[in-house]
From Swiss-Prot:
UniProtKB keywords: Ribonucleoprotein, Ribosomal protein, RNA-binding, rRNA-binding
UniProt keyword annotation of Ribosomal protein present: yes
Native organism: Azobacteroides pseudotrichonymphae genomovar. CFP2
BP-aspect Gene Ontology terms: translation
Cellular component terms (Gene Ontology): cytosolic small ribosomal subunit
GO molecular function: rRNA binding; structural constituent of ribosome
Record protein name field: Small ribosomal subunit protein uS15
InterPro entries: Ribosomal_uS15, Ribosomal_uS15_bac-type, uS15_NS1_RNA-bd_sf
Length: 89
């Protein structure tokens, strides 16, 4: 499996406040970014997988909403996560 609990804890430890902090926007954005990159690679091979394409668009929307929330609440954390993950703005 591409995303196991250890991998999630790694993302939360690196971008969240602790290993079990799954609620912080930074941890969720990092997790969504990993899933988005994985689905993008899948769609390069399977071009007609429309269900995966829809789920990718939904994930991008979720990440966008979290980024907008973070930008409204704390611009410093927003800039850090954008630079750290290499997300275009």
């Amino acid at each position: 499996m591409y995303l196991n609990p250890e991998k999630k804890k790694e993302f939360f430890a690196k971008y969240g406040k602790s290993n079990t902090d799954s609620g912080s926007p930074e941890g969720q954005i990092a997790l969504f970014s990993y899933r988005i990159s994985h689905l993008t690679e899948h769609l390069k091979v399977n071009r007609k997988d429309y269900n995966t394409e829809r789920s990718l668009k939904m994930l991008v929307g979720k990440r966008r909403r979290l980024l907008d929330y973070l930008k409204r609440c704390d611009i410093g954390r927003y800039r850090f996560i954008i630079n750290e993950l290499g997300i275009r703005r």
